[in-house]
Amino acid sequence: MTLHTSPILHSLLDTDAYKLHMQQAVYHHYYDVDVAAEFRCRGDELLGVYADEIAHQVDLMRFLSLNDDEFTYLSSLPFFKPDYLHWLRGFRFNPQQVSIKNNAGKLDIRITGPWREVILWEVPLLAVISEVVHRHRSPNVTAEQALVQLSASLESFRQHSADVDLSQFKLMDFGTRRRFSRDVQQTIVTALQADFPYLIGTSNYDLARRLDITPVGTQAHEWFQAHQQISPTLANSQRAALQMWLREYPSHLGIALTDCITMDAFLRDFDLPFAEAYQGLRHDSGDPVDWGEKAIAHYQRLNIDPMSKTLVFSDNLNLDKALALYRHFGQRVNLVFGIGTRLTCDIPGVKPLNIVIKLVECNGKPVAKLSDSPGKTICQDQNFVCELRKAFDLPRVKKAS
């Protein structure tokens, strides 16, 4: 197997925006917290054969740093503080935090260290894994082929939406982590910027800066997971996470992720003060229509006009699914659609990887993501899952994977 030695990543900002948003909050409030995260391939693919090449790319990541233009760009945004940005300027990836093994054909990756540092590994490392695998599996695929497929998808969208008022349709690129390649993502986002007036942003800070697009993203599951061990009381951990986020970002980045414990448990914690303070909610697992109906009903019970709030859908979307949700909810609540893999790895003959890196420990103790989709549940410690379900008064479900 040919080893590609040139670096895949060229910028520290080639990551999802919410990683920097969370990192700043961790830097300010949880500087000494340690965590562990692990790689999961949700399919049955054996990716261990690529371990050496992935490890080489991880080693090259130690040379990435914030340059002057990037520092100036981040400084222009209203929610970053000078102390964090000066610290970030000195940040370097430490490859010794990452263990990569070919375990009988299975790819094993474990990342350990201070949360403020470990937090930045997930997205660029997933992008590296995806690009390494696709380089070998589809060596002749070009960005032009991705562009042809995008053109067909946009034409289909235009035909299917001809009878719909799209003035409030909003699309965000969420495609960094499982992209076919860095080049393909840039090609796709550039094309959308030129040809699709409903694109409002990208989660990728590097592309946002270079293409002058709005960067988008708030927090991920790990923010809520870590609080399961940071909070003195497990049953209060989700509220603690929501409250600390508001402490760091009282007037920005106000979309809350709902499915770390399940939507029902989230809504029990999401009382009137939180519902008023947060701009809206993000869906990432479970039936999107059921979820949206629950969200709207919750706002109505609290006497909050749903049209004053925003629902962000980001779970395995494509343009057709987004359009169906827009038809269903568009007159009742503000909507934004985050599409990832179906934009940046939507190429005929190419099978996208279903890969994640998730937090598994905080301060040496287990954390869990239960989700609204059993297949997305992550925890190694079944006793802790039982504790979590009891603390949040959840019914028994399928065994965690």
Curated annotation (Swiss-Prot):
SUPFAM superfamilies: Nicotinate/Quinolinate PRTase C-terminal domain-like (SSF51690), Nicotinate/Quinolinate PRTase N-terminal domain-like (SSF54675). GO terms for molecular function: nicotinate phosphoribosyltransferase activity. It catalyses: nicotinate + 5-phospho-alpha-D-ribose 1-diphosphate + ATP + H2O = nicotinate beta-D-ribonucleotide + ADP + phosphate + diphosphate. One of its GO terms (cellular component) is cytosol. Transiently phosphorylated on a His residue during the reaction cycle. Phosphorylation strongly increases the affinity for substrates and increases the rate of nicotinate D-ribonucleotide production. Dephosphorylation regenerates the low-affinity form of the enzyme, leading to product release. Pathway: Cofactor biosynthesis; NAD(+) biosynthesis; nicotinate D-ribonucleotide from nicotinate: step 1/1. The keyword Phosphoprotein applies. The modification Phosphohistidine is found at residue 221. InterPro entries: N/Namide_PRibTrfase, NAPRTase_N, Nic_PRibTrfase, Nic_PRibTrfase-Fam, Nicotinate_pribotase-like_C. Its EC number is 6.3.4.21. Pfam families: NAPRTase (PF04095), NAPRTase_N (PF17767). One of its GO terms (biological process) is NAD biosynthetic process via the salvage pathway. The keyword Metal-binding does not apply. Disulfide bonds: none annotated. Keywords: Ligase, Phosphoprotein, Pyridine nucleotide biosynthesis. Belongs to the NAPRTase family. NCBIfam families: NAPRTase, PRK05321.1. Catalyzes the synthesis of beta-nicotinate D-ribonucleotide from nicotinate and 5-phospho-D-ribose 1-phosphate at the expense of ATP. This is Nicotinate phosphoribosyltransferase. It comes from Pectobacterium carotovorum subsp. carotovorum (strain PC1).
